[in-house]
UniProtKB/Swiss-Prot annotation:
GO molecular function: calcium ion binding; phosphatidylinositol-4,5-bisphosphate phospholipase C activity
Sites where the protein binds Ca(2+): 282, 284, 286, 293
Top-level class of the enzyme under EC nomenclature: hydrolase
Catalytic activity, reaction form: a 1,2-diacyl-sn-glycero-3-phospho-(1D-myo-inositol-4,5-bisphosphate) + H2O = 1D-myo-inositol 1,4,5-trisphosphate + a 1,2-diacyl-sn-glycerol + H(+)
Function text: The production of the second messenger molecules diacylglycerol (DAG) and inositol 1,4,5-trisphosphate (IP3) is mediated by activated phosphatidylinositol-specific phospholipase C enzymes. Required for cell growth, osmoresistance and expression of GPD1.
Signal peptide bounds: none
PI-PLC X-box domain residues: 382-520
Enzyme Commission code(s) on record: 3.1.4.11
Organism: Saccharomyces cerevisiae (strain ATCC 204508 / S288c)
Entry cofactors: Ca(2+)
Protein name: 1-phosphatidylinositol 4,5-bisphosphate phosphodiesterase 1
Ranges for domain C2: 713-862
Amino acid sequence: MTESAIDDQRFNLTKELQRHSCRDQGKITQKDDALDFISYSSFQSSFNTDQKSANNGSTVRRSIRSIFRRAAELPRVHMGPLTYSHGINELVNKKLRKDCDLSTLCRVLQRGIRMIRMTRRRRKFYEFKLINNNGQIIWKDGSKYLELDSVKDIRIGDTASTYQEEVDPKRLRSDSKLWIAIIYKVSNKLKALHVVALNELDFNTFLSCICGLVKLRRELMESILLPDNSQFARIHWQITVSEKEEDEKKDTLSFADVKKLCDKFHIYVSTGQLLEFFQLADINHNGLLNYFEFEKFIKILKNRKEVNMIWSKFTKPPHSHLSFENFFQFLITEQHEQVDRQTAWSYFIKYREPTQLTMGQDGFTKFLKEQPYLVEVKEELYSKPLNHYFIASSHNTYLLGKQIAETPSVEGYIQVLQQGCRCVEIDIWDGENGPVVCHGFLTSAIPLKTVIRVIKKYAFITSPYPLIISLEINCNKDNQKLASLIMREVLAEQLYFVGTRTDKLPSPRELKHKILLKSKKTSEATRGLSVNEPFPSSFSSSYESANEQELRMKDDSTNSSSATNSSSMQRIKRIGLKKHADIINDVSNISGIHGIKFRNFSLPESKTIAHCFSLNERKVEYMIKDKHLKLSLDKHNRRYLMRVYPHVLRYKSSNFNPIPFWKAGVQMVATNWQTNDIGQQLNLAMFQILDHQPDGSFKSGYVLKPKKLLPVVTKAKMIPLIYEHFENGSDPVTVKIRILSTQLLPRLNDTSPSRNNTNSFVKVEFHTDDEPTMPISIDKGTRISATEASTKSSQGNGFNPIWDAEVSITLKDTDLTFIKFMVISEETQIASVCLKLNYLRMGYRHIPLFNMEGEQYIFCTLFIHTQIL
């Protein structure tokens, strides 16, 4: 029995079960029919094939055309999301109702489920409905809606409790188990829809339906856009024309049909080039494509000339297949893989022709697509003291936007921890009912306990290595006691104290699944060692200038009627905070790292093993410019910890260039993760390296410093000798990168300047700590500066544009060198990626591309070839 026949029988059985379960609803309507593809997809993935049962099924065939054709009539609607979200893997695995299929659940939600929408101001009943044609959930009579493709995560149970306390502190206990928080994005801003179901059945139905649809729409994009040519053609034909094999010869597609189909599935080719492909496939020359001609059209469309060139290099005529010996040679000479023959054979077997001992071009292309592009790190590299590592660090973690008047949110902590951040910041202030977390600039606040619970939940979701919490204590002694009690109770055995250890800091491997608090020492502990300091050393020095602004705001607000409610008054109280916040023993005793006020590097407090200086970017930049201070800074950071954070004038949460601070050996270079500018892209690239962990964890958040930054010295004057030694032992490095092509390039939106323009080029930027020994050059493009160049424009093809341009640059070394690729059309950036150069594997690699918000496109990649000579 053929696979397609089995699929048909699977569907028939599914359809029969579905009809049986819905008998009381009468005849299945066209709206029901529109959901058949949902039932088929979900059932196909879970059904164990039973041919005997299948043969007894009905002869009803599935019809998925209706949903796609109705969707095709909506010009702004595509078939699924373009990008992945950081929490998508956890999201799509949520499934509570197993007693019925997704199609049945969706029918219920189409009719509407009555629930309570929760906001900080009110609780109100609404009927929530699914509009299946364009993937929306609507309420408030359709005036409010949520796009399923914009959903980033769904929180229930413990993960939703933090939102419950934030939105409705006086909620009923019975609400907690029925609360659903949907995190989604609108205009690049995260929002949350909080709903409470009226009963467990509605809760399970709504949750299972939303999670199932989000998962299905993502899989739809993956399965339709990425299969082999024949499968690709069949899926698109069935969606657009007919599912019946007997119709393949008589049904046809016009050029207008093909153009609409391409647009719907993010296939952007100029009208002229698309017409050329259409005419090449139109063997009958009748202006229409039957199925076999359409299959040829897909083959022409997806033909990759750049891969053909690689293929012909290793398969000399008359051979049309790749032998194992040639494949092994390709791995060693082109890919620079350090593999033995046994490992190479395992790759070869996976991608070879099913019945032969050779590899075809389709298998070879698939191999190229699926090969990793980043190097891996072994766990033994995490055995050195903490001060030997760069640590992924966040500034103002609780903010999702600019600093002034921005509402704090636990979502900030969830997002950075999902991305591998290992040092988060908590600003603790006095609240009406205990310690709260906020920025202090007339913002609302989150209960500290809520934040600590979220951190505990997500602390090790991505990385098993230690998490550092940088505490900014701005509250009175009573709230400090409460804060220490909260952290002891919630974090419990995960808290780590350095104690009396004086020789060296523990390693990341020793501290797996541990949490270290960083706070200022008590005034008693620092008395006699330093002058009185009104704020914790880790407290942002920006407060001094900001406090003056806040006091003026306080004076202006005293007579304002807008500050009459208790929440606003509490914000004013925080502004009038006294200029002194002594740290009590309760907080200091549970801290593993102690922040101290920086005066100079020679005092006794600068030599305690667990101390940490916390300085703003300008103070460190000043040190770097001074010859003697620069050496002292370098010497300190070889043995002790330091944290650098953005200056107060970055009120829009922009980021600095982190490279000079890494070059100075600073471990915790804290950036605003909520802003995806070049500073944050460099920061993410530094910690993008994958870990070879048994549990599959990745993005450890710890990167071993370059070797020249590791040797501990007793005298600062020894440091130049270290650098001289490493420079003498290494030659300049020439980097050659051939930019070949991109695949499935997306279009920004319908109103973008490149709406009807499929011409694009790639801009390349090298970001490094030193001037290049030899500036950048490019063979098919334009040099912009010593470190920047751009390719020529690829005309007419936005689906798989080819550039085949090589850039070359010579550098002193690659320890702190990053490369950024940007795909640009009509001066509009479509996609980009930033990589640390020495993480990049050699040879041919497909690099995933990201949108302007830093989210990875599901199907868009950049194909390059890299050599380091």
